[in-house]
UniProtKB/Swiss-Prot annotation:
Subcellular location: Secreted
Entry superkingdom: Eukaryota
Name of this protein: U14-myrmicitoxin-Tb1a
Tissue: Expressed by the venom gland.
Task of the protein: Venom protein with unknown function. Does not induce paralysis when a high dose is administered by intrathoracic injection into the blowfly Lucilia caesar.
Ribonucleoprotein found in the keyword field: no
Disulfide pattern: none
Keyword vocabulary terms for this entry: Amidation, Secreted, Signal
Gene source species: Tetramorium bicarinatum
Residue numbers bearing the Glutamine amide modification: Q35
Residues in the signal sequence: 1-23
Positions of the pro-segment in this chain: 24-25
GO CC list: extracellular region
Amino acid sequence: MKIIKLITIFTMMATLMXXVANGEPIPPNAVKSLQG
C-alpha cells in the first residue's frame, strides 16, 4: 500500500509541476487529493 501511495503522490506532483510549467491553473481536485 505504501508503494502505491508513493507512486500516486509522485504522479500528482509531476502533474502539478507540468501544469505550472505550462502556465495552466492547477485543478482543485488535484490539490485536494494531495492534501489528503
